[in-house]
């Protein structure tokens, strides 16, 4: 079973700039009308999937808090009160993918800059990230993978650690995608598939302008920790299961002022 750390993670991640980063889950909507990129390719869960995950999350949360008095605040339902989650430091493994000839990979400076962006974004949430190791692999198939067998092969060969460790795979994925991630609930059935895949050019210093500031990883790590998009569930009352984010009927691109798609 996946670790309690990540299934409880949503309780500490409410400060993330996810509304500003919200993009399409299915990867078929262009970011800011820029046909060059399709933004987030993380699989959008069905409402039934969300319900089952929430039930599992609450069971783990109640078990963790059993006998410890007042339960912690936040959680999937975004409730308030209680104690704050304990700070957690997450070990990170970067697996840089290059072509067979060793071309196209990100630099160590980019990796370090990306780690800084990630930690800055999660400051105040109770989570911080420390780079444990960077590996380099030369493989044409992995270098352009958009999923399927080549992704499975890549992760099976490279992934390190348990459910608590974050494995990141920057490469030159095709299809115009900027990245995708697995949710904590996927770990039990597919532990080797766990992790985050991003376009290397989206990291600081990359050429995926205007998406080259490192925010793609921030966004995808939110999914890896258990957060949904702010438009999950549309205008339904529970929405993304976080009470302090307003419901949205659809994804918002950029930072539109005064946007309200769920009136009334």
Regions found by a protein language model. Give the residues of each.
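Bacterial N-terminal signal peptides that target proteins for export
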Residues: 1-9
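A generic, residue-level signal for flexible/boundary positions that often mark functional hotspots
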Residues: 8-10, 100, 192, 236
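Repetitive helical segments and hydrophobic/amphipathic motifs
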Residues: 12-15
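N-terminal signal peptide c-region/cleavage motif recognized by signal peptidases
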Residues: 17-19
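Short linear motifs centered on Gly/Pro in flexible linkers and helix caps
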Residues: 21-22, 240
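Propeptide-to-catalytic entry region of secreted or membrane-anchored zinc metalloproteases
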Residues: 23-166, 170-175
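Metzincin-family zinc-dependent endopeptidase catalytic domain
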Residues: 112-258
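Short, intrinsically disordered, charge-balanced linker/junction segments flanking boundaries
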Residues: 260-264
